[in-house]
């Protein structure tokens, strides 16, 4: 094969295959072939063959080219650099460029994870104590704080600003503190309602007294409130405070409010100086700030100065919105110079800029204000033609509302409906998707005109579009129904308002319920009010007052009694005047004791079924204490500071409507009792104790208040075996005392895993905690029960019941079927010994889990724990409170009278059986 033939073959191979060949390898092969006579063309090698026949052994050439020996004087070819291997991933350069742009966009949208979060292994950075505190970011508006924000916003939308303010203010003292966004929402709502003094007071409360860090929006709102109230100097003080102390600079909105206030106060020179200061601080030229100054100079008649500022704005403003042209148009219309006004309008249209809804709305209002309806309709139609969402938004609900209101003002109701549904005439224009504000406006307008048929049609259309429910439209419909004497429809609309969780404000609710009761809708009013009480926030006390008085005047005493019970249960509170009225009415009917029993009862907050046991009870919706509510003694430590309560310890995880073991009742001197809910179970009284005897420490209540609790075995509680524990239901503000322990002391209670050991800590080998052998003054009498009344004690078998009755002072308290004189030693136990309570089987939980507090322990008192509960059993610790002056449980030195080890083991085996 010749060299040229081989080169052609190699060239063909390299052009038809995608895998490239190494240039150095190709040169080496060509070099070997050129020196090998075996590969030469036969026609050109005839002479060489003859020489080889003549000299057969002359430089023999092997057949394998790889074994060919290159002469020493031969110079090897220069090696070329290797070509890197690259696959052709794109068909064109444009496709490759598009891929690069896509990757860059993705990096901008999705930054790498290491840029989003800090390395978890790295220690947290230390905060500079001298660094200024920064306001909350939007990432703080999550979880419970977001729920609080939504609740406040719902109250604001319902126009119940007092309830929203109360909720936000009282949340400062809870674990869920409001964010700066929640504070700004209620402050802005007060400003919009022209309640400037309350807005300023809320700012002082949140950001100065409650130590919440304000942001620039907070300062802008308080500056705006000061300016509208006429206190421009106070607004300037806030502005100087921002410059001196805030970790951010004032925004353009800050200068808008300040220049507006200064111009309204007649200090236009100070406003101009503030504009120069804004520009010197690097702020961009703002058309609204310039418009405030131009409006001020036009009002003063200084047209040249206004034009000067307008020219300055056009030279500095990069994006002009056309609002200043509307100011000049209004000025010329007021002067009666319509020609100049329209010339200013045409100059604005000649700019061919995209008109946004705020600018178009201002121009529409100017045209309609001065009777230029043709120009207004032409501008409205042009805005509809240019509306092509999502890229171009030329119309909003305010735009349509302006023209609809003009139609109602002129009495053209059919034209109002057509305007409401009007669409642009251009091919590219799209219909405006009306929001709930637009539907609320047209429904309100029809209700004002008494056109309930059209109002109902648009109201139903808004509901069918799944728009968010709004309180103003519901209130307008209810008022229209009452005005038209359609009482049943008014009741249905009020019921729907409650169903969609809209707030019924105090003034509106009192007026509507009064009208319903006046028209004989007593039962319906009570039903709607009951449904309102099941939701948060609770109805205002004034609404309850109107309904209760109406029911009493209508001789519906049973329903009035139920409503009063709901007021007590919801912690709404009964005023003194209403209380006297109710008692007087029921006394005339001979039912005074019945209503007094309800009025003197005290509701206890019930934890929701979804809450865990290690969280404090839910704060009622309406704060404050009921007059009959018992107060917590001051010397008790609150239970909320303890972290040892488990979710299955029976803290009232009941179903809806269940009360956790009863409620506080003032039983005219009766002592509290533990009452069993079963019919065949007897009550065990904690009363009738002789002088010198000390009641259990957990039952100490304030004078005049007793606690009636029950061993109620209700379904839905969190005990493992269905045995419910019913020792909660405290009123708002009451907390379970856990024994005034000094720091460092902790009591480990029940619900420990089998691997955990419960032991009587820090006792000497000779010390034993005695439940018996107490002096006559130190014994606890277990209720002087009649003979035969036995207390079933935690799943005992038949015949294994303990009688706690009829004990004399010299008798001892038998624990777990002990005979008189037997003592139960709780100390000196080895690790393998285990205490059991009253014949429990594996997996059962004793009903005696009313964990009594350790009374008044001091720093020298030891920590109490039980020893090694049997696997599957939940240890039933009953800390004793048989304390006298020393407030310590009895201890006894080791002696012959103690229980021996064999007796103890026999007792344990017997209890297991």
Curated annotation (Swiss-Prot):
Residues 650-666, 673-690, 706-727, 762-791, 815-845 have a biased composition (Low complexity). Residues 34-138, 607-913 are annotated as: Disordered. Residues 74-84 have a biased composition (Pro residues). Residues 134-167 are annotated as: Leucine-zipper. This is Pentatricopeptide repeat-containing protein At1g10270. The WQQ domain consists of a repetition of W-x(2)-Q-x(4)-Q-x(2) motifs. Belongs to the PPR family. P subfamily. Keywords: Nucleus, Repeat, Transcription, Transcription regulation. GO terms for biological process: cell division; embryo development ending in seed dormancy. PPR repeats lie at residues 179-214, 215-250, 251-285, 286-316, 321-355, 356-390, 396-426, 435-469, 470-504, 505-539, 540-574. Pfam families: PPR (PF01535), PPR_1 (PF12854). Ubiquitous but preferentially expressed in gametophytes and young embryos. May function as a transcriptional regulator essential for early embryogenesis. The gene is GRP23. A motif (Nuclear localization signal) lies at residues 99-108. PROSITE patterns: PPR. It is found in: Nucleus.
